[in-house]
A protein has these predicted regions:
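Glycine-rich nucleotide/cofactor/substrate-binding loop typically near the N-terminus or early
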Residues: 70
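ATP-binding/phosphotransfer module of carbohydrate and carboxylate kinases, centering on a glycine-rich
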Residues: 1-66, 74-78, 96-104, 118-133, ...
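Histidine-centered metal-chelating micro-motifs
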Residues: 142
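Short acidic loop-to-helix transition motifs that present clustered carboxylates
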Residues: 113-117
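A charged helix-plus-loop insertion that forms the helical arch/lid used to bind
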Residues: 79-91
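General beta-strand structural signal in soluble alpha/beta enzymes
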Residues: 106-111
Length: 258
């Protein structure tokens, strides 16, 4: 891993955030910049905002790759889905779009995958050498799987069918808010979700991210699982940090899964 700060950018449905990351420390090297996501979040419009963020940090970063997260399945630089962003992203050559717009190397990754990498490299699962499964509970459910520190990308475990339903329509944090559930009422939905995921993968550790992770003490002790489960440590910094780490790792280890 290089010593110069690396730029990580996190594209979300409402905001696009970027920060320089110190990969030796596993944290931001300078304050984060946030720009609202364009109301029409097409690839061209989003790339323009990303270019603004890059310009802001250009004189403080090296000439290495930029890591960018996006709420989509990403295979070989192509976005295969689109969650909370314009549907024109589906099957778009997104990594090339960003690289062409910025005039530099870009590594594009799924947002939950980036967060999971950050938690294993620097956060709640730091240096864990087993099977770590991270879920982010938000508008939907994102997921990341890492085995011995290596990412297995695009797991999309929010879309498991459980009891006839797409899992995230029953257990995402947005459902708790929509239905006005207390944590005591919500925990049963989480129990069902995690016990199914546990039976499929038998991970060594669950890490839970998303806004509800700050209230982990209100629901985690009530979950009856065989797998240890812990809240994420990096919170809303994880995506940016993970993107920066993956950008450098992709250059150093091009054989990793894409």
């Amino acid at each position: 891993m290089q010593n110069q700060p690396v730029l990580g950018i996190d594209i979300g449905g409402s905001g696009i955030k970027g920060a320089l990351v110190d990969l030796a420390a596993g944290d931001f090297a300078a304050p984060r910049l946030r720009i609202p996501t364009p109301s029409k979040s097409t690839p061209a419009n989003v790339a323009d905002v990303v270019a603004e963020i890059v310009a802001e940090f250009a004189d403080k970063m090296g000439d290495g790759p930029i890591g960018i997260t996006i709420p989509a399945v990403v295979t070989h630089g192509i976005t295969r889905s689109a969650a909370n962003i314009d549907k024109s992203w589906i099957d778009a050559p997104a990594e090339k779009i960003f690289s062409d717009r910025l005039g530099r190397s870009v590594v594009l990754v799924n947002d939950a995958d980036a967060a999971g990498v950050a938690e294993v490299k620097f956060g709640a699962a730091r240096d864990h050498q087993g099977l770590v499964l991270m879920t982010t509970l938000g508008t939907g459910i994102g997921s990341a799987i890492l085995y011995r520190g290596v990412l297995i990308p695009n797991s999309e475990l929010g879309h498991l069918e459980i009891d006839g339903h797409d899992a995230e329509t029953q257990a995402a944090a947005s459902i708790k808010t929509l239905l006005g559930l207390s944590y005591s009422e919500y925990v049963g939905r989480l129990q069902r979700y995690y016990e199914v995921v546990e039976a499929l993968f038998w991970p060594d550790l669950f890490v839970v991210g998303g806004g509800v992770s700050k209230d982990a003490d209100k629901f985690m002790p009530k979950l009856k699982l065989k797998t240890p489960i812990v809240p994420a440590a990096l919170r809303n910094r994880a995506g940016i940090i993970g993107a920066a780490w993956l950008a450098v790792d992709k250059v150093e280890h091009p054989e990793r899964p894409a």
